[in-house]
Amino acid sequence: LLHSNSITYWDYIHTDALLGLQIQRTNLPDEMVFIAYHQINELIFKMILWEIKQVAEGESLKVDVFQDKLMRISRYFDMLTTSFNIMREGMDVAQYNKFRHTLTPASGFQSAQYRKIEFASTELINLIDIRFRANIDRDTPFEHAFEHLYWQAAGKDHKTGEKSLLLLGFEKKYKDEFLRYMEEYNTINIWQKFKQLPDADQKDRELVNAMRHYDYTVNVTWVMGHLNAARKYIDSGKGSGEATGGSDWKKYMLPKYQKRIFFPELWTKEEIDNWGENL
């Protein structure tokens, strides 16, 4: 209180502005659930990026600080995973299949913050579509690597190279920003910061477990929570079977297809081979 003027809760949180951002495109009541839920996700993504930034920019990080940041991030993803019940049980399927058509080609696929979380977590090679990894390395130009990221499969016909409106709009808005971000975090992503620790710290069992927990939470637990929520609506038999935006959602989302693993060196061959299986 000695360092600030008095302020009200609503001014500090900007409640009026925050609560004025949920703008529906239809008069279907459950669209409000869909909008607010995704906005909450974006706020949590912002908090995750805030923690990652502190790791990336930290000098001479101690094991306990590194571990604390990882567990903070993991708890955010744990919360996001359990919150999928809000989506899965909180919307009427018939309403969803009506208002979803007003969203095209918008999609949660187009969350720029989530892409940044991925770029800031791991080596770029681990985000490349598994079909193209053999021909890409650290010397590959960022733009070429960008064209072969795993999520391009959700919006591109790799036989013709033609991109969907979903992907074209996303790239028009964010591609330049992504390329700068990819380059910035190339040497300060979470994996690089881990490898910069002293050897003894890299072998710290609690830190390794925190790294593994974060990896599995993001790339399997959270993804499957998202997939299971999507299945209820997309595979309900009451709609077209396409995701919002028309993405190839099964190939894009199922962990076993793309083997998205942030820290493969921390997993055994058997664990990697069975990644995303038997869930």
Regions found by a protein language model. Give the residues of each.
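Surface-exposed peri-terminal alpha-helical interaction modules
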Residues: 1-279
